[in-house]
Each structure stands twice: as structure tokens, then as C-alpha cells.
Amino acid sequence: MEASFIRSLPSAGNFANLLPTGTALIFETLLPSFSNGGECNNKPVNKLLTITLISFCAAACFFSSFTDSYVGQDGRIYYGIATSNGLHILNDYPDEGYDPESGLTADKRERYKLSFVDFVHAFVSVIVFLALAVESSDFRRCLLPEDDENSWGGHFVLMIKYFAVMVLTMASFFFAIFPSKRRGIGISDIR
């Protein structure tokens, strides 16, 4: 039992890395203001702001699934975006005369190329974010119909809550079985 628990810890950490903490923090911080505390029944501006916030955060989750980093031969950490040709470096220092890609071997270059798994991870990351967003009471009160528990709206909200729990459980299994090889921007451990 102890060995299986120890083996599951890296998977739990990987799950936390796949949903960008900054994105979740921005969402939880701005949602009460944008949704007027969940009271946007007759205020289309608040609904629009809430939908815009959710869209922006979902796009950030999707985009962050394609970011990676590595340490160059000069000891600096380089951040980039995965492309079909490899990693496109974002923080290059051309004025110092060092080529950050010169330290990458052919097998490392291959590792940083965009793959189908990256798109699957990006899609699942967005689904996880949306499932967590639905769990917010401000989100539900602003955008989902909520009548008494015996009406269709009440059943719909209850179904959404259970659906979110199911999605999060399935995503945690998915991320444990198919861990991401991307480290993202801001992950401090060095390979």
C-alpha cells in the first residue's frame, strides 16, 4: 500500500501542473467582480464579462499546454513554445552571441516537437478548468438557470455539479496514465 501511495504522488503533482495555477488564481480573483457576485440576471454586461473571463482563462490553459523550458549550456533557463520543428525560444539573448539551441542534441530536439498528445493534454486541461469553473457558485448563479430543486433548472444545476466531479476524477486518471512531458513556464525543477 505504501509503495503505491508513493508512486501516485508524482501523478498528483503532474495533475496540479496541467492546470496553470495562475490561471485558476486569476479566475477565482476576478470572477466575483466580473459576475457582480453572481448577480447578473438583468445585467448583460456582467454576463459578457464573465463569459469573456472564462474564455480567456480557458485559452490560457490550452496555450500553456504547449509551453516548455530547459537549461541551456550557459546555465540559463530558456522558455519556449512547442512547434512542429521543435521549441521556439521566447527569451532568447541574441545580443550576447549565444545560441540557446546549440546545446540541444538531436534526441532532445525531437522531444520538444509538437505531438498529438500535446493537443489531447491541452483539450483535457481546458475541460478540467471548465469543470472547476462550474463549481464556482458565482459562475452558477450568473450563467446557469437555478430554480427550486424540483424544477428542470434545479436538476440541471445538480447534474452539472456531479458532472464536474466525474470529469475531474476521469482527468486525474488520464493524467496519471498519460503524464505530460512538457514542463511549462515557471516550473522550477531542471532536467
UniProtKB/Swiss-Prot annotation:
Membership in a protein family: Belongs to the plant DMP1 protein family.
Location (main, coarse): membrane
GO molecular function ontology, one term from the record: kinase activity
Keywords of this entry: Kinase, Membrane, Transferase, Transmembrane, Transmembrane helix
Tissue distribution of the protein: Restricted to flowers.
One of the GO BP terms on file: endomembrane system organization
Taxonomic placement: Eukaryota, Viridiplantae, Streptophyta, Embryophyta, Tracheophyta
Membrane topology qualifier: Multi-pass membrane protein
Membrane-spanning parts: 15-35, 48-68, 114-134, 158-178
Record's protein name: Protein DMP10
Domain of life, source organism: Eukaryota
A Pfam family per the record: DUF679
Protein task: Involved in membrane remodeling.
Location(s) in or outside the cell: Membrane
Matching InterPro entries: DMP
GO CC entries: cytoplasm; intracellular membrane-bounded organelle; membrane
Species: Arabidopsis thaliana (Mouse-ear cress)
